[in-house]
């Protein structure tokens, strides 16, 4: 199923760690990125802007293949 705005997702640790996106930021990715659901708020090409609502942080951009949809 295609991911669209409003979809709940979780980052895949193995695909995010060591990626170009991770290297462009702090090398220690916070656990909430992998342990809490995030909501897709925008989509541009292969990238998703994800807002993690459990913590007061700005949204982050991740490639679509670095996340998995959470079954509702």
UniProtKB/Swiss-Prot annotation:
It is found in: Cellular thylakoid membrane. Keywords: Membrane, NAD, NADP, Plastoquinone, Quinone, Thylakoid, Translocase, Transport. The keyword NADP applies. It is a peripheral membrane protein. It catalyses: a plastoquinone + NADH + (n+1) H(+)(in) = a plastoquinol + NAD(+) + n H(+)(out); a plastoquinone + NADPH + (n+1) H(+)(in) = a plastoquinol + NADP(+) + n H(+)(out). Its EC number is 7.1.1.-. It holds the Pfam family NdhO. The keyword Transport applies. Signal peptide: none annotated. One of its GO terms (molecular function) is oxidoreductase activity, acting on NAD(P)H, quinone or similar compound as acceptor. It comes from the Bacteria. NDH-1 can be composed of about 15 different subunits; different subcomplexes with different compositions have been identified which probably have different functions. HAMAP family: NDH1_NDH1O. This is NAD(P)H-quinone oxidoreductase subunit O. It comes from Synechococcus sp. (strain JA-3-3Ab). The lineage of its organism: Bacteria, Bacillati, Cyanobacteriota, Cyanophyceae, Synechococcales.
